[in-house]
Amino acid sequence: GLLPWVASLGPGHISRLERHVARREAWVVDITRGDGSVLEGFLRLDREPAAARNVSLQREAAICRTLTATDVPVPALLGWSDTHHAALFSRVPGSADLPGVDDPQRQRRIMEDFIGAIARLHCLDLDSLELDEMLGARPSTPAEAALGDLDAQLHAFAAFLKHYQDPLLGYGAGWLRRFAPRQIARVSLVQGDTGPVNFLFEGDRVSAVVDWEWGHWGDPMEDLGNICVREFWNPSGGLSGLFERYEQLSGIPYTRAAAQYYRIQQNVRGMIPIHAACSQPGLRESMAWYLSYRYVGDRSTCEALGDAMNVAVEAPPMPDTSKDRSVLLAAASATLQRDILPELGSPFARSRLNDARVLVACAEREQRYGEAVRAACCEDIGRLLKTQTRPYEQAIGQLVEAIAEERVADEPLIQLLARKAYREEWLYQPAAALYPERRWAALD
């Protein structure tokens, strides 16, 4: 079984096993050896591995094993099990809570050390890494570098997307193809999801860059777009001057247009599995957090598109909030918050119960305001397409078709998509409040 395999890596007996509070399943593990010494590990599991998947725990394990021999700080891989699709990493000292650092100057020093680690990563000799078998062929054109991971996501989720209509995903994917970079400085190993909270720090120094399951060959500018996105979700003092510092350290030219492009690429690529998760009953992971990622993320994508295209976007008026609340759903939410949450001792159980409370609150708002939000969206689509657009599902289908056929100009379409996203973020406010008042940091 899994636990005997984990214990054998000590070797010894498991003296600590605690569920880590995170979106993906992970466990804090201590293995006590016969001589009394303790191996401190971090166990990651992939319970639903997919063949030929471009995002995987196995990929992360291989990258960490390779990078241990470089000057890019990563957790050591202590063991990988093909049988259990499990990886045991060393538990690196440090904190990931960069937003919680209350000294702006220290926050800045940490981010500068981090950007140095990313600069070193992007300058590594690819042949010496011997990762081609795991990561596949390297991109041979700028378009392949920019679109390879997006195309892999579209392929991986083809069955879901065949029956799922979302105008922002459709427009975003098309936009990325239209505006893909025509030249890049080089192909690098990119982390693919890098930035605040995906690295640990001690003092003012990065102790480990973590979460490598998205790692791949690509344009180094992609990671700068990733940093924009992660700083959006995890505000850490802004980005002013950091990308210029990256250029000085790496010798790789930075452009504002590249950062604008790749923050949209990161969002569109990342939103495909998030939309899929939000459509999945009985999701093993936290639906509340996925709803937050979806609706805050969709709004941020629209704002990034507006910025890249010089299109002004703004929130529309929201529905009347005077409609009576659902007595049953309000009572359920209050019971979870008032009576059950205080009685739970496990941090993981408390986290999941709070997630359930958020879902109940979202259901209550959906019941009160969902129809009004969808009606407003139908009116917007009708004005744009100059046609009658009811019911809602039919209106969305007509918009998706118009986008695919390129019958709508960019500016009014981006503005419509933004109004839709603002309304949906408002509708799912209890989930969106998990990441309150998130805004893009200014770019160099």
Where are the regions a protein language model picked out?
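Juxta-kinase regulatory segment immediately upstream of eukaryotic protein kinase catalytic domains
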Residues: 1-14
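Short, surface-exposed acidic
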Residues: 12-17, 252-260
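ATP-binding pocket architecture of kinase catalytic cores
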Residues: 16-149, 155-168, 184
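Active-site acidic catalytic loop and adjacent metal/ATP-binding pocket
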Residues: 22-32, 37-43, 85, 121, ...
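Short, solvent-exposed segments of well-ordered alpha helices
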Residues: 51, 195, 233, 258, ...
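Active-site activation/catalytic loop segments of kinase-like enzymes and analogous catalytic loops
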Residues: 221-254, 265-286, 293-310
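Charged, amphipathic alpha-helical linkers/stalks
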Residues: 307-332
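C-terminal amphipathic alpha-helical interaction region
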Residues: 323-358, 363-444
